[in-house]
């Protein structure tokens, strides 16, 4: 993963870590600077001194929760997908007080967030380090479709989607489905959840990709949360993701979904479950897992291929650059 450090809007450093492969595609998140003044919400990383005096790379996710409230999540080792040890997680809380700096407090640290960096002290007021702001971008964002792909949506009118509604900016709104039916495939999806800081749970930027109209890969603003089986990246109500790879809302994110349909014999009896592998922002979050049956409000399982749906759950989730390769 390559991610770019921001300091007052300037790129000042880059880091590179590993990549991964999905069905022949090279996948790895990459970061890019965005212009303008950032909010406090976002991702930060840097070296902090731990209680034993040793330096440790540390990540921090700052989550807007509405009405001036903020949640901070300190992650030992780094950000999700970038060296976090997937074990140690410390929460901090704070409230905007009308000053340029947001102050968060946890049982062990105080964090002063100015939107570009975070000054961290222990409970005695001693400095333990500074975290810099990073903006991460999935390296699969903007991936062009291969020659064998069917382009579902590329920014304009399309005959491959039914009930497609397109914004003046050329983005796809929720509530459409493919005109064709599909059996086994690899699917590329780019999506963006809205900023809804006061919303909670399933009311916070909800949509979903319904494979064959039967199995939902959930889309939700789950940034900074401990993933449950109905959060972003989950196989809805069946399995949470291995790792919460959600970026902040209003950030473009990607799914790569490698899907194999359930198998049935000539008598219509099920002989094998549907299986899939999912990458979220380039990181594998499900590896060849079995689906026990349809998810949520999905259509009943059967041998027939069916369309892919992009769920309308009432929130303004947006899509772009959708394409599929049949297997």
Question: Where do the protein language model's features map onto the residues?
Answer:
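Cleavable N-terminal signal peptides
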Residues: 19-21, 30-31
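Carbohydrate-interacting regions of secretory-pathway proteins
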Residues: 54, 63-68, 73-327
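Short, solvent-exposed loop/hinge segments that bridge or flank secondary-structure elements
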Residues: 27-30, 35-67, 160-169
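Small side chains
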Residues: 18-19, 46, 72, 94
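Bacterial N-terminal signal peptides that target proteins for export
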Residues: 1-17, 23
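Alpha-helical interaction segments
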Residues: 15, 33-35, 242-245
């Amino acid at each position: 993963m390559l991610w770019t450090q921001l300091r007052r809007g300037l790129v000042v450093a880059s880091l590179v870590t590993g990549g991964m492969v999905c069905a022949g595609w090279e996948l790895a998140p990459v970061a890019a600077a965005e212009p303008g003044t950032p909010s406090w919400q976002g991702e930060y990383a840097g070296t902090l001194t731990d209680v034993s005096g040793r330096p440790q790379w540390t990540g921090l996710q700052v989550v807007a929760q509405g009405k001036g409230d903020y949640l901070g999540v300190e992650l030992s080792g780094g950000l999700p997908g970038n060296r976090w040890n997937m074990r140690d997680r410390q929460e901090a809380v704070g409230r905007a007080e009308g000053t340029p700096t947001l102050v968060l407090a946890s049982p062990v640290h105080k964090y002063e967030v100015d939107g570009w960096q975070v000054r961290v002290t222990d409970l005695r007021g001693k400095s333990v380090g500074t975290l810099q702001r990073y903006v991460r971008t999935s390296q699969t964002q903007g991936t062009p479709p291969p020659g064998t792909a069917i382009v579902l949506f590329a920014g304009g009118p399309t005959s491959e989607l039914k009930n497609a509604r397109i914004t003046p900016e050329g983005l796809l709104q929720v509530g459409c489905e493919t005109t064709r039916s599909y059996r086994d495939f690899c699917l590329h999806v780019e999506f963006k959840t809205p900023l809804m800081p006061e919303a909670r749970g399933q009311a916070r930027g909800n949509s979903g990709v319904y494979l064959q109209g039967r199995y939902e890969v959930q889309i939700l603003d789950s940034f900074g949360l401990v993933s449950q089986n109905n959060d972003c990246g989950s196989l809805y109500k069946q399995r949470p993701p291995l790792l919460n790879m959600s970026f902040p809302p209003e950030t473009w994110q990607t799914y790569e979904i490698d899907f194999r349909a359930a198998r049935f014999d000539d008598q219509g009896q099920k002989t094998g479950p549907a299986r899939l592998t999912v990458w979220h922002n380039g990181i594998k979050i499900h590896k060849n897992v079995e689906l026990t049956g349809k998810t949520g409000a999905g259509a009943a399982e059967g041998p027939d291929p069916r369309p892919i749906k992009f769920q309308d759950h009432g929130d303004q989730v947006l899509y772009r650059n959708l394409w599929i390769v049949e297997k």
